[in-house]
Amino acid sequence: MAREKFERNKPHVNIGTIGHVDHGKTTLTAAITNVLAKKGQAQAQDYGDIDGAPEERERGITINTAHVEYETEGRHYAHVDCPGHADYVKNMITGAAQMDGAILVCAATDGPMAQTKEHILLAKQVGVPALVVALNKCDMVDDEEIIELVEMEIRELLDSYDFPGDDIPIVQVSGLKALEGDSTWESKIEELMKAVDASIPEPEREVDKPFLMAVEDVFSITGRGTVATGRIERGKVKVGEEVEIVGIRDTRLTTVTGVEMFRKLLDEGMAGDNVGLLLRGVQKEDIERGMVLVKKGSITPHTQFEGEVYVLKKEEGGRHTPFFAGYRPQFYIRTTDVTGQITAFTSDDGSNVEMVMPGDRIKMTGELICPVAIEQGMRFAIREGGRTIGAGVVSKILK
């Protein structure tokens, strides 16, 4: 059977449901697919389809995630839903499911709970740009005043984490009633999706950003020069353009004299392409895995940064023992391991801790032995002897 072609006639946006356990994230996700399926914009899925999320591995970490897709009039969405709280933490920190925005699900019967707060904090820390609130289980609350109080509480909570609490839409829904086909509540799901369309900005396409390719391999072609291969992370590169080689050693300038993909010559390579770039005047010894090729002047290498880190439990293949400040692991950044040191850390809420236990989430300061192209929002893994013991996201560049 021929593979169905992915139609690119609508902008694509990645979103997900976040919020406290049992507030109805998965039921709401199922309800969205069912309501949109009636207009031919999704395949209807029930709770069980989504809840039985398969395991995935991302940077050596096992995560359960369910993926559904659907469309609205103006957009195509890929939507992620995670069964367990730990899956959310791992998913958001590893960037396994990069979110352009999220639907925060909060039950009107409970109001904001511990994980509601934790997911809002996590969304802020990993750079989820926009939220829409689905106030769920509204069919179970008769008193309009209670609903108003819960809405106020949610807005104050969003404000306290630097989201624009007053402006974020809060839509009253009942995932369960919509799933049962109650037309009043079905129309509320449509209202929610209109709010998502309007409030979650369309992401800048990777291809429109400045060029960057992490070097995976280097070889020389007799009579032609040195070729660096890798996947173009963003932007595009044309034959004849100047690019900089950044990281590990001093930054240097070179010219791209050829772009190859699947042994064919191209005029240009763009985001997502796996290419070989022929570089003028560069010896094989001058360039190595872990460096990046970038648009001139678009990026500088750094050695010191702050990060949000999830440290793997022993059962997940992580360490069996705690570590302390001064710990020297490898940081796996893009395509290579760089030795570094964790010079300081606090728990994720900013309180002081003496040591880090497997399973902890921390804020840490890291220092690398050589400068590499790190950027805010970038993901990395922490490794020890080739195995992953933690995953993180760069929250701030220090030096």
Curated annotation (Swiss-Prot):
Reactions it catalyzes: GTP + H2O = GDP + phosphate + H(+)
Keyword Plastid assigned: no
Cellular location(s): Cytoplasm
Residue numbers spanned by region G4: 136-139
EC class of the enzyme, as a word: hydrolase
Binding site for GTP: 19-26, 81-85, 136-139
GO cellular component, one term: cytosol
Annotated segments matching region G1: 19-26
Positions of region (G3): 81-84
Sites where the protein binds Mg(2+): 26
Any one GO molecular function term: GTP binding
Protein EC: 3.6.5.3
Function summary: GTP hydrolase that promotes the GTP-dependent binding of aminoacyl-tRNA to the A-site of ribosomes during protein biosynthesis.
Annotated family: Belongs to the TRAFAC class translation factor GTPase superfamily. Classic translation factor GTPase family. EF-Tu/EF-1A subfamily.
HAMAP family: EF_Tu_B
PANTHER family: ELONGATION FACTOR TU, MITOCHONDRIAL, ELONGATION FACTOR TU-RELATED
Protein name: Elongation factor Tu
Taxonomic lineage of the native organism: Bacteria, Bacillati, Cyanobacteriota, Cyanophyceae, Synechococcales
